[in-house]
Amino acid sequence: PILHSKDLVNWKVVNYALKELVPTDFYATVQHGRGVWAPSIRYHEGEYYIYWGDPDFGVYMVKAEDPAGEWSEPVLVKAAKGIIDPCPLWDDDGKCYLAYAWAGSRAQINSVLCVAEMNAEGTKVVGPSRIVYDGNDDVNHTAEGPKFYKRNGYYYLMFPAGGVQMG
């Protein structure tokens, strides 16, 4: 759902970015623990983008000029089992990147964060993935949910370490 608020206290559902989950034949029945995981919403050059990880199929994206308007059909940005929690970054040099984590339940690895270059439209990963953080040090285990920013010439990747299983 897409929610709107004028005061950050009272919220109203104004739309839904997805009409149905894809692949539709797979999601024709309820699939506990599957589907949309940890979406990120970003605004870039007049459009809103939502990226999410489906731990069984990969990273998807939809976009719209108006959050209350028509959203595009889902685009598979990167096909891979176990990729979750994606967050895009459009750099000021025109390049676009995707940060993401891994679901141990699907990929047999976790606590690893990666960044990959996408095409300028943000619709496809075009470069190799690079590990930018490995939390398998028994101190910061279960690193996930990265959020990617650039401010004053510096890149920031923020994420919870230790997991989110307790809320």
Task: Give short role names for the model-derived ranges.
Residues 1-167:
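Carbohydrate-active catalytic/glycan-binding domains of CAZyme proteins
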